[in-house]
Structure formats: structure tokens, C-alpha cells
């Protein structure tokens, strides 16, 4: 089985649950993990954008990775986000993830400098060479300021056999279509996962493999059921779930960054966890909590 086969379907980018003093809330995180696995997800991604990796130090990231891997205990594949602004720390975190027992790593491009294509390729190759784990690229140009183009991704897939997929977080059907055509056309087992809830259906229609999207934290059943209907050949039923997913991104407009929105949605949908977030994020105020509750109720998610 190709390494990439581990990372298809619905893989929530798990929110990191914190205590009021900013420490990892182990019981809260464990309960969320258990809920998601029971919901039928295909894997779990820790320390992505929604996991607040960018607000954490390297040792904190290692501790969270270790806890998550140990608690999942091989029930589903685990991806650990290891990217950042410098190659040395990314390599250190990637090697730690491998030693801790991760199934793969997710690596975003450096996001302070605008990096030349040659240097981007070198960066990802250095990270891929530092581990034997499967490496999933992470494209989020709205936050990094720099797109990983399909041509660049194909070059990386050509170059390193353990670069096996991409989380393509971009609000563009054309970009997803080109990524699938360009990279999967040359490497059929290369995994293309969308990063936005409302792109899951069209990603599957285009020949992609699933989603790593935020609603997996508070409404995993919608994406899980959409994918099941798709795999069963019931396109009309899948399209019905798509109608719900189309409405979810409006919730994320309630604040920036919207990690607080996700945690409040988890609570409103029935899992009482701490909604503490790390600066520069801040708690969602009461008026916006009320707006969020109304949106979730309109979609019959709570």
C-alpha cells in the first residue's frame, strides 16, 4: 500500500485545548480526540493552524505531539505539523515527530521571507531528507503570502519519494483542479486534500482525496457522511451534505484568527472543552458567540 493511502478521507485539523494559564489541557484534548475517532474520521492532524502551532514554542509543540500520538494509540493515522519559519527547527520537530511515533508530518512553507522557488525546493528537500516519514506539503497562501504552485509541487514529488501529498488550503477550484491534474497526473497515488470545508465535494469530483478542514472539530459527521455517500456512489446525497458545508465558512468571519470560533463551536455542538486560546488570539465575545450559535442552529449542527 502506498504511504499516501494512509492520508485520504476526512482528517480533522485538531484544535489544541488549553487551560486558562495556557498549558495543554490533556483531559480536554483527549476527550476531543476520542470524539473525533468515534465519529469515523480517517486520521487526525495535530499542530496545524487550528492547533495554534504558530503561538507555541518548539518544546511545547514536542510535548503536544507526544501526548497526541500516545493518546491516539494507533487507532487512526496521525499527522504532526512541523513547519515554521526556519529549516533547522522544522527538521528538529520533524525528527521528533518520527521518534514519537507519528505516521507522517505536514510542512508549511516558511512564511516571513518571500522565498525563491529554488530555495523553497531546497527547504522541502532538506526536511524530507531528514526523516523517513511521509511528508505532506501545506499550502496556505492567504497566511504565508506565497503559493505552492502545482508545477513546484510536482517538482518536489518528482524529487523525493516521501513527499506524498498536499493540504491545499486555497479558495480556488481552479487551483485544486490544476494540483490534481498536474501532480496526480504524474503521481497517481499523490494525495490532494482541500483545506476549506466548502471545497470537499468539488475536490472529490475533480479526483482529489478528501479534506483537512476546520469543521471536522465540531461537525465531523457532515464531512464523514458526505465522503461515505460519495464512496457509495450516491452523488445526490453527497451534494446534500455539501449544501451544509457551503454555509460553514461564514462562521470563520466572526474573528481573525478564528481558532476561538472553532472552540466555541465545539462547546455549542456538545463537547464541553476549555475555549482558551493563545495570544494574539483572544476569547470570542458574547455577541459573536450568540451569532455563532444562531448559525449552528440554522444548519442543525447544535
UniProtKB/Swiss-Prot annotation:
Instruction: Give the protein name, as stated in the record.
Output: Putative 2-dehydro-3-deoxy-D-gluconate aldolase YagE
Q: What else is known?
A: Part of prophage CP4-6.
**Cross-referenced SMART domains, in alphabetical order?**
DHDPS (SM01130)
The answer on whether this UniProt entry bears the keyword Lyase reads yes
Q: What happens when the gene is disrupted?
A: Disruption mutant has reduced ability to catabolize D-xylonic acid. YjhH-yagE double mutant cannot use D-xylonate as the sole source of carbon.
Cellular component annotations (GO), alphabetically ordered:
cytosol
Q: How does it assemble?
A: A dimer of dimers.
The record's section on Pfam families has:
DHDPS
Originating species: Escherichia coli (strain K12)
**Could you provide one GO biological process annotation from this protein's UniProt record?**
aldonic acid catabolic process
Amino acid at each position: 500500500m502506498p504511504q499516501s493511502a494512509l492520508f485520504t478521507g476526512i482528517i480533522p485539523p485538531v484544535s489544541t485545548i488549553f487551560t486558562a494559564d495556557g498549558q495543554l489541557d490533556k483531559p480536554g484534548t483527549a476527550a476531543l480526540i476520542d470524539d473525533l475517532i468515534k465519529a469515523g474520521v480517517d486520521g487526525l492532524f495535530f499542530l496545524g493552524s487550528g492547533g495554534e502551532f504558530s503561538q507555541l514554542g518548539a518544546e511545547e509543540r514536542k510535548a503536544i505531539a507526544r501526548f497526541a500520538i500516545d493518546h491516539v494509540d494507533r487507532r487512526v493515522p496521525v499527522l504532526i505539523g512541523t513547519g515554521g519559519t526556519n529549516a533547522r527547527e522544522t527538521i528538529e520537530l520533524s525528527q521528533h515527530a518520527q521518534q514519537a511515533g507519528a505516521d507522517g508530518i505536514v510542512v508549511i512553507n516558511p512564511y516571513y521571507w518571500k522565498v525563491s522557488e529554488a530555495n523553497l525546493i531546497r527547504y522541502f528537500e532538506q526536511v524530507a531528507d531528514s526523516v523517513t516519514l511521509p511528508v505532506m506539503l501545506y499550502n496556505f497562501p492567504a497566511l504565508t503570502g506565497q503559493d505552492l504552485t502545482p508545477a513546484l509541487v510536482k517538482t518536489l514529488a518528482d524529487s523525493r519519494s516521501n513527499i506524498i501529498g498536499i493540504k491545499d488550503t486555497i479558495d480556488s477550484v481552479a487551483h485544486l483542479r490544476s494540483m490534481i491534474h498536474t501532480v496526480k497526473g504524474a503521481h497517481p497515488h499523490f494525495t490532494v486534500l482541500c483545506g476549506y470545508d466548502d471545497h470537499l465535494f468539488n475536490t472529490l469530483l475533480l479526483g482529489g482525496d478528501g479534506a483537512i478542514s476546520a469543521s471536522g472539530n465540531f461537525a465531523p459527521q457532515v464531512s464523514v457522511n458526505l465522503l461515505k455517500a460519495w464512496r457509495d456512489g450516491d452523488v445526490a446525497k453527497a451534494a446534500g451534505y455539501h449544501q451544509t458545508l457551503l454555509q460553514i465558512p461564514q462562521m470563520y468571519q466572526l474573528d481573525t484568527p478564528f481558532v476561538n470560533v472553532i472552540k466555541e463551536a465545539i462547546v455549542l455542538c456538545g463537547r464541553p472543552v476549555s475555549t482558551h486560546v493563545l495570544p494574539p488570539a483572544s476569547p470570542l465575545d458574547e455577541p459573536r458567540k450568540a451569532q455563532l450559535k444562531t448559525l449552528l442552529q440554522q444548519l442543525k449542527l447544535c
